[in-house]
Amino acid sequence: TLACHALLDCKTLTLTELGRNLPTKARTKHNIKRIDRLLGNRHLHKERLAVYRWHASFICSGNTMPIVLVDWSDISEQKRLMVLRASVALHGRSVTLYEKAFPLSEQCSKKAHDQFLADLASILPSNTTPLIVSDAGFKVPWYKSVEKLGWYWLSRVRGKVQYADLGAENWKPISNLHDMSSSHSKTLGYKRLTKSNPISCQILLYKSRSKGRKNQRSTRTHCHHPSPKIYSASAKEPWVLATNLPVEIRTPKQLVNIYSKRMQIEETFRDLKSPAYGLGLRHSRTSSSERFDIMLLIALMLQLTCWL
């Protein structure tokens, strides 16, 4: 509670800033040591899932199929730490359901994904069957791991991925479908994805109308950064969506609307990392993934307080 109060006052999620703003009469150096002991508390590390379990029962109550957005983010580039987060899509900002820090070397690895899904399964209510929404960075091994839990998944497919008709070997690049897309979403029925590790799923197509957005990046700073070109190409490219949801459960238009909520998780990442618009976690020099997990838990408690 004191750490959340300090974060609300200083709006900077670092060890020293939390210590400097603790609402106690102790000297600053003792408050900083107090936060340091909190981040290194092994008992709290073990009980962390119990907190998320209580949190999940609260925000998922009454919804047997929550829309869960999942994505990676480079929280601390200098310390080479990544965070994998699951958020429940709501009106406006999504609310974090569960998140865990991993070393950069484990980003997008099957080991990290399986551990994350196992933790997520342990905190969700038993009567819940979530729809996991992810971007094109998640591949077939992720889809199959989600299916093993009896859950549904919805993901975008890009790049050199191939598809084929069921029972046939007529493999073609997924980019061949782009010319068939329009502003009216449609389903192509069930197809097979990836020749090396095939999976059967429903394929959908959609191309949104141009929004006329222009690059506003400064011409003096980072003007040659490659990210605007990458994001622009992704935004202009039609959506090829894949899902294991039965055709009769959701219409193509409903599935497109669900996937469009994925940007909510990007907004909450900015709320957490940005020094200008959020909690400034990017300035943290914490190098331990376990200690980072506690900092994420403090941020979640503040987010939940503001959401309520």
Can you say where each PLM-predicted feature lies in the sequence?
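Single, function-defining residue in the core of a domain
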Residues: 1-13, 50-51, 63-66, 79-80, ...
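Acidic/polar N-terminal loop/beta-strand segments that form early-domain functional surfaces
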Residues: 21, 38, 71-73, 89
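Electropositive nucleic-acid engagement tracts
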Residues: 1-2, 6-62
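Short beta-strand scaffold segments in enzyme catalytic cores
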Residues: 84-87
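Two-metal-ion RNase H-like nuclease active-site motif
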Residues: 65-75
